Amino acid sequence: MALVFAVNAAVCWRLWFADFYGQMGSVEGSFIAISRYLMLHPGDHRWFPMWFCGIPFVRVYQPGLHAAVAALAMALRLSPQRAFHIVAALAYSAGPVALFWLCYKLTKSRGYALATGLAYSLTSPSLLLAADLRRDIGGVTLARRYFLLIGYGDAPHLAGLVLVPLIVWTLHEAVANGRRRFHAAGALLLAALMVVNWTATVGLALAVIAYFFAQARAVPPWRWLAAAGIPVTAYLLVCRWIPPDVLLSIPGNAANSDGTRYDAAHWAQLAALAGMLAVANFVMERARAHPALRFFVSFFLCSGFVVLGRYWFGWSVTPQAHRFQPEMEMALLGALLFPLWRAWDRLPRSVRTGLTAAGILFCGVQLVNYHRFANLLTAPIHVEDTIEYRMAKAFERENPGGRVFAPGSVAIWMNLFTDTPQMVGCCDQSVPNLEQRIAFYTIYSGQNAGARDERYSELWLKAYGASAVGVSGPNSRETYKPFANPAKFEGHMPVLWREGDDAIYRIPGRSGSLAHVIWPAQEVRRAPLHGLDVAPLIAYVEALDDASLPEARLRWIDERRFEVETGLQPGQRVSVQMSYAPGWSATAGGRSAPVHADALGLMVAEPRASGPTRLEFTYDDAAELRLTGWGQLLGLVLLLVQAIGIGGAHAGPALPER
């Protein structure tokens, strides 16, 4: 295991000490920003005001990795980006070690485990299977897993993959070997995985499905039923950070992120996969294949069906199906190297010596190759020279305290460099509602808007409280250049800042406040069907600039309380351009002021007052915390029962290895 870890640590050597490097298109900027926020608000971070017009912190992202980064940074007095890269390097190095451990525990062969761990460390067979992946990275001998980590910022996914083989091992011990105490270990590991990354959690689900098909006939049914308590216990242990409403929103948001549809074709694909697994395991069982081989073949069928189905046929078996490449490579290498291990002792000594020498030479060449590639990806830069930093600082300077709509990679890195709140942010799983997704899609694409592109975009920007918008043109250094029509605001909005092909525009408005007095008829009552269906917005946006309505001043008191001061006439309401969430309440003059969501998902309060009025808004999720607290207590009880191993540590003989 130490050798496998050392090889990977050597590949990513520069990452252990990295600050900033030339991969500003990576989403890691958003992850580091979350850790920075935790460092700045260690006591109370239940509300996160930076993204999507403010959202509960539990909706931002699973907190496990970001909390670990923040804790490391504060303990060692490091910058958040330095701490993040240490954790990322550790995750990269430990993933193959976890695969080594699973292979060893399934076969009791250190040689097979070492070969699989090193192959996973120094090869990427997915590059041979999908031309799009080869074009993305530039060759078949390059470090795809490191490219995912650095180029795309997939650190939470790779951190989760450290846990996936370990959870499969605990499942094997629990159901195949009947060791009940491994239920508790599995629950703890699964709980950790759930608070780290959803993609890796879905990858684990693919592995568990594969394991079930591989062992279904060999394991007594009651053991499978007992194992069902593992995910129940795991979820209860972490439900405080992943409450039920958040859990239920994840599939829909993930599907919306790439257009996955759960239609008849999708269910036909799943049925085909189930049929393949059943046939493959029937054949392997008749051939008396080793349980480890059955598992890895089944795991490859599951993960390969998802990944290669996307690249070969355009299927979306799961949302974001292209992201499960590391899981597929784990499975494929475990399956490919298994026959070599079984035949190894029967090979002539000269052949074994030759294969060993060739393997050592190959590993040496690939180690140098991977190390050079990693150094190229992780070449240090002066972040102050990047457009992401410069535009973020320009937003902070030219639009102090105001909400902004930032383009592409500027939005990703914005809140590592500043505390500027954003209309959008990261990540797809965090989008509070469909209307916000419609809004930023329309602003970026202008699809079918024609000559009214600027007008539609301005309506959406004003409706969601943005006071400045940044645009990256075709010659910008910004990575994604997401605006289909980057010139649409030119001549319609005043320019606050310009550098090369990048500009920040001031969105015209009477007030920079996020609080506004409106009449009930001006509230957005119907959700727009698409980005050009702006009729529901017009009365509301016009009210924002109506000089006959009193202005409202918003001031934050602390992390989850703010006050609004205004003058009201009877029947008037206060619209606050902040995402509504259960837990928000308001008082006016010591009396409760009902708060609800409008059709855009923003807050509206009914003060039922007149004259000078001060409203105090408070986000208090105490009811949810009490409920999830009881859930955690139940989870601890179940964990204790599993740890004690009622009924004995061994409930039956281990399965024979064939």
Functional labels for PLM-detected ranges:
Residues 1-16, 101, 354-358, 634-658:
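Start-transfer (signal-anchor) and selected internal transmembrane alpha helices
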Residues 424, 536-655:
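Active-site-proximal, structured, solvent-exposed surfaces of multi-pass membrane proteins
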Residues 231-235, 340-369, 635, 658:
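Signature aromatic-anchored transmembrane alpha helix within multi-pass, membrane-resident enzymes
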Residues 155-164, 199, 235, 240-241, ...:
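Alpha-helical transmembrane segments at the extracellular/periplasmic loop-to-helix junctions
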